[in-house]
A protein has these predicted regions:
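Membrane-proximal, lumen/periplasm-facing interface regions of secretory-pathway glyco-
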Residues: 44-113, 123-126, 130-138, 143-146, ...
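Hydrophobic/aromatic-rich transmembrane helices and adjacent perimembrane loops
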Residues: 4-48
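Short, well-ordered secondary-structure micro-motifs within conserved domains or adaptor modules
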Residues: 154-166
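Short active-site oxyanion
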Residues: 112-117, 158-160
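Short, flexible loop segments at boundaries between secondary-structure elements
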Residues: 146-156
């Protein structure tokens, strides 16, 4: 029943992945008994047909699931659409973090010591937390989902690199903001890495951090 509900709700297939072996095993028991009831000739045809279908299915799945299509190609776009847009979200994250690191390096030394990186979404925050340590970046500050529970650090940052936010948000949240860079990817593929492409360096949060943080929690 959960499997049927997931199909009806068009949920992501891998959420049910731990249940697939159980479902396959249950089907295999029934299938084995059914094939055993057939004549040897029919059983042989069924077995060969099954193996051929599995081989074709494996090739099709590999073409769609594995990252082997050239990014931006027709094949890639078809696979991306079949996967619900997951492929395009794999593009550009290292470049994003490298751009943030370059902006950090351009700041005065005294500003780097109390630096924070405010990310709009869990994608940006995850990329910063994954690739950032090798570049000496601090952990991302993010209000989305469970990232909000991790807070903004102690002591709170004084200089903030704002990623993925609109200019209106940056200017309303901070007293001073300047565009310091832009987000892009070498394939020109539009995804959440290049949504709100400006990266800002901001100073002087207009509210105390605890008050700002209480109103900054959101879900997505």
């Amino acid at each position: 029943m959960p499997f049927v509900l997931f199909i009806i709700g068009r949920a992501r297939g891998y959420y049910m992945a731990p249940a697939y072996p159980v479902l396959f095993a249950a089907g295999a028991v029934w299938g084995e008994r059914w094939v055993a009831s057939l004549s040897s000739r029919r059983a042989l045809v069924i077995r060969r047909t099954t193996w051929i279908a599995l081989a074709i299915g494996a090739l099709v799945d590999a073409a769609i699931v594995l990252p082997i299509a050239p990014p931006g190609s027709s094949w890639w776009r078809f696979a991306d659409k079949a996967r619900g847009g997951d492929f395009n979200e794999e593009i550009g994250w290292p470049e994003l973090v490298q751009t943030i690191a370059s902006i950090r390096d351009s700041l005065p030394v005294q500003e780097r010591s109390r630096l924070g990186i405010l990310a709009a979404g869990s994608g940006q925050a995850g990329a910063i937390n994954l690739y950032g340590p090798a570049l000496g970046l601090p952990k991302a500050i993010c209000g989305m989902n469970s990232h909000w529970l991790r807070g903004y650090g102690d002591p709170p940052p004084e200089t903030v690199i704002v990623v993925g936010m609109t200019r209106d948000f940056a200017q309303s949240a901070f007293e001073s903001c300047q565009i310091a860079g832009h987000v892009s990817n070498r394939f020109g593929i539009e995804n959440s890495t290049i949504r709100n492409t400006d990266i800002f360096v901001c100073h002087s949060l207009r509210q105390p951090w605890p008050r700002f943080w209480q109103g900054f929690q959101y879900y997505g």
